[in-house]
UniProtKB/Swiss-Prot annotation:
It comes from Escherichia coli O157:H7 (strain EC4115 / EHEC). It holds the Pfam family MFS_1. HAMAP family: MFS_SotB (MF_00517). The lineage of its organism: Bacteria, Pseudomonadati, Pseudomonadota, Gammaproteobacteria, Enterobacterales. It comes from the Bacteria. It is found in: Cell inner membrane. The gene is sotB. This is Probable sugar efflux transporter. Belongs to the major facilitator superfamily. SotB (TC 2.A.1.2) family. InterPro entries: MFS, MFS_dom, MFS_Efflux_Transporters, MFS_trans_sf, Sugar_effux_transptr_put. The chain crosses the membrane at residues 15-35, 50-70, 81-101, 103-123, 136-156, 170-190, 209-229, 246-266, 275-295, 299-319, 333-353, 364-384. GO terms for molecular function: carbohydrate transmembrane transporter activity. GO terms for cellular component: plasma membrane.
Length: 396
């Protein structure tokens, strides 16, 4: 059975299963944001000290995305997915059993290894397995899985951690991954590597200034976002003085707003992708600047989180669409680079938030985040004027 002869129903089932996998991988990456206080309490540490776990995870992904992708470039994709899921599940069992913070960090590094490979191949696999003429919808489903990780995954993970302990959150993610793995084994055909690219692809990609500019924009804007977002849970409780339940609700609201951003991008992205991304970066800048002033009211923080969530979803979708459009001949290499660069931004933002919290005040995370956000806004305006046609290739 090949991907060309299967029924549309089976083809969609494969894409949906990949979207569920995307949901699980994004949930485990983001869920520590909602568990920092609980993990810190468990190991008798400061919240800011535990936060370094976010940076380690993100930078391992950043460092290993391209090497792992190149090492596995000729490996049949079904076998590769099964292997990385086994590593992913085993690492979550270790997270559940963690008897020290060091062991927890080691388990997260194992998850990061699996993550590094998964995100470099997922978009291209979704396109390959989609029914004829439905590639855009397949990518949209993967993006929906990503969005739902913010909408449901992170808040549910926090709720489980709140009532059953943070270890159970990681255990539940491992169980979800096991079920998904069984579905993948049943549904996926043999998937020989295609358009994976190689080291020979790198000089070609590096000679594309529009693509390199998108990568730079990605790392700067993601740094801005994660400077504040990494510590939003302790910020809400310790700086704003609101309850743990409100922190959970706020994470749910911020994630849910991402669905609105996805709908907006779906309707307007084909014609106005560049303008949407620049507008979203400007909106992120405003949200970060108003984070501390909004902390005096639950309503103000709630409204701010809605706009924040919308902005980040539009930015994330816009960056991914442009990368895929600018490197159709080496999608796996381009997406491995994108995943690595995105995670450099996550790690940098979490580290900046960590240092601000330790040496200045956690109340300052929003203000500090405005610096890279402003730089990203200026850069986006420059590059979208410099390469207006190239960056809109995906609309043709």
């Amino acid at each position: 059975m090949t991907t060309n002869t299967v029924s549309r129903k089976v083809a969609w089932l494969r894409v949906v299963t990949l979207a569920v996998a995307a949901f699980i991988f994004n949930t485990t990456e983001f869920v520590p944001v909602g568990l920092l206080s609980d993990i810190a309490q468990s190991f008798h540490m400061q919240t800011a000290q535990v936060g370094i776990m976010l940076t380690i995870y993100a930078w391992v992904v950043a460092l290993m995305s391209l090497p792992f992708m190149l090492m596995t470039s000729q490996v049949e994709r079904r076998k590769l997915l099964i292997c990385l899921f086994v590593v992913f599940i085993a690492s979550h069992v270790l997270s559940f059993l963690s008897w020290s913070f060091t062991v927890l960090v080691i388990s997260r590094i194992g998850v990061a290894f699996a993550h590094a490979i998964f995100w470099s191949i997922t978009a291209s696999l979704a396109i390959r397995m989609a029914p004829a003429g439905k590639r855009a919808q397949a990518l949209s489903l993967i993006a929906t899985g990503t969005a739902l990780a913010m909408v449901l995954g992170l808040p549910l993970g926090r709720i489980v951690g709140q009532y059953f302990g943070w270890r159970m959150t990681f255990f539940a993610i491992g169980i979800g991954a096991l079920i998904t793995l069984l579905c993948l084994i049943k549904l996926l055909p043999l998937l020989p590597s295609e358009h994976s690219g190689s080291l020979k692809s790198l000089p070609l990609l590096f000679r594309r200034p529009a693509l390199m500019s998108i990568y730079l924009l990605t790392v700067v804007v993601v740094t801005a976002h994660y400077t504040a977002y990494s510590y939003i849970e302790p910020f809400v409780q310790n700086i704003a003085g609101f309850s743990a339940n409100f922190a959970t609700a706020l994470l749910l609201l911020l994630g849910g707003a991402g669905i609105i951003g996805s709908v907006i991008f779906g309707k307007l992205g084909n014609q106005y992708a560049s303008a949407l991304v620049s507008t979203a970066i400007a909106l992120l800048l405003v949200c970060l600047a108003l984070l501390l002033p909004a902390a005096n009211s639950e309503i103000h923080l709630g409204v701010l989180s809605i706009f924040w969530g919308i902005a980040m979803m539009i930015i994330g979708l816009g960056m991914q669409v442009k990368v895929l459009a600018l490197a159709p001949d080496a999608t796996d290499v381009a997406m491995a680079l994108f995943s690595g660069i995105f995670n450099i931004g996550i790690g940098a933002g979490a580290l900046v938030g960590n240092q601000v919290s330790l040496h200045l005040s956690m109340s300052m995370i929003g203000y500090v985040g405005t610096v890279p956000a402003f730089a990203a806004l200026i850069w986006s305006i420059i590059i979208f004027r410099r390469w207006p046609v190239t960056l809109e290739e995906q609309t043709q």
